[in-house]
Design a protein with these regions (language model features):
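Conserved catalytic core of the tyrosine transesterase superfamily
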Residues: 1-207
Length: 207
């Protein structure tokens, strides 16, 4: 079993980075891995522990460390900024990849490589547009476009999208024979699926 270490606190770190290069990772990606692992090395230095003392509790403390602006940045040794959950998870993913490499190299890891769990992320809930805002958007070509034909075309497209929920690619590919006199539109969707949608009276006025 391999137990030799690099000159720094992280064993086989240089070998790991070299392996990334050998597998055609971009220089930017390799740099990001190196930077993320330098943060982990800083954490070890501040906690005054070494790799052999690694355990699940240390990993949880590292997550708290990443969440704190009191941590030191690599090289400059300055206070860091608050990291978003997505940035913390990217840093933890780098650590998981490094641990996985050590496992593949049969290095005696103090903990399983997959013991590093990602943190929960906050879901960004997109604001639903107000009805008045949607109507204003649909009507905008009528007073923003100088060319009458362009205004009429764009208004018809937006009215159709608003009334039917069709994809824009579906609207742009419509032919006149796809619409019947009742306002029903025949759609050939993805995977050759076929369906019908119906225009509102309002939308039909602009076609």
């Amino acid at each position: 079993m391999k137990t030799n270490s690099s000159s720094n606190n992280l064993p086989l770190l240089d070998d790991f980075l070299l392996n990334l290069k050998a597998n055609h990772y971009s220089p930017e990606t390799v740099y990001n891995y190196e930077r993320d692992l330098a943060i982990f090395e800083n954490f070890f230095a501040e906690m005054k522990i070494d790799f052999s003392q690694l355990n699940k509790k240390v990993i949880e403390e590292y997550k708290a460390y990443l969440s704190s602006s009191d941590r030191k940045t690599p090289k400059k040794n300055e206070k860091g900024i608050d990291l978003a959950s997505s940035s913390i998870n990217r840093t933890l993913s780098s650590l998981r990849s490094y641990f996985h490499y050590l496992s593949e190299m049969e290095y005696d890891l103090p903990i399983p490589w997959d013991a590093v769990k990602l943190v929960r992320t906050e879901k960004n809930h997109s604001r639903v547009a107000e009805f008045k805002e949607l109507v204003k958007l649909v009507e905008s070509p009528s007073y923003l476009e100088n060319e009458p034909k362009t205004a009429a075309r764009n208004r018809a497209i937006l009215e159709t999208l608003f009334a039917t929920g069709m994809r824009i690619s579906e609207v742009l590919s419509l032919n006149s024979d796809d619409l019947d006199e009742t306002g029903r539109i025949f759609i050939r969707g993805k995977g050759k699926k076929e369906r019908f949608v119906y225009l509102t009276e309002r939308a039909r006025k602009f076609l």
